[in-house]
Amino acid sequence: MAIPSGGGSEILKGVGFDQSAAATVDCITATTHQICSILTVTLTCTGGANNVSLLTGTKYILYNQAIDSGGTFIWNDKVVFQAGDIFKIRLHTATQVISYVSYIVQDWS
C-alpha cells in the first residue's frame, strides 16, 4: 500500500474478548486502504495461569507471556499493520482470559 496523500478518516476504537479455549482469535483485520495502530492490549487471567502470545499475520510480536491466575498484563508497545494483516491473540492454555485492545484505524478509501 502506498503512503496516503489524500483525505481520510482516523477513528479510535476498542474491542474486547472473553476467551477460554487454547486457540488463536482474530481480533482486528485491516482491510483495503486501512492502516491500524494498536495502542494498548490488556490481558486479565480470570481462570488458572495462562501463557499468551500476540501476532500480526503469522509473525509473533509477543510470545508465550506468562500471566498468573488473577493477574493482568498490559502491552503498551505500539504496533502498526496494513491491509491484509490480522492482529491476533493466542492462548496457550484453556483457561479464561479477558482481553481488551484499543487501536486507531486510518481509512484512506
Model segments located where?
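Short, surface-exposed beta-strand/strand-loop-strand elements in extracellular ectodomains
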Residues: 47-65
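Exposed aromatic-hydrophobic patches
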Residues: 72-78
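Noncatalytic modules at the cell exterior or secretory-pathway interfaces
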Residues: 79-96
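C-terminal interaction-tip segments
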Residues: 1-34, 40, 91-109
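Short, surface-exposed secondary-structure edge patches
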Residues: 64, 78-79
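Buried hydrophobic-core signal for structured, non-transmembrane domains
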Residues: 39-44, 87-89
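Short proline/glycine- and polar residue-rich coil/turn motifs
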Residues: 65-72
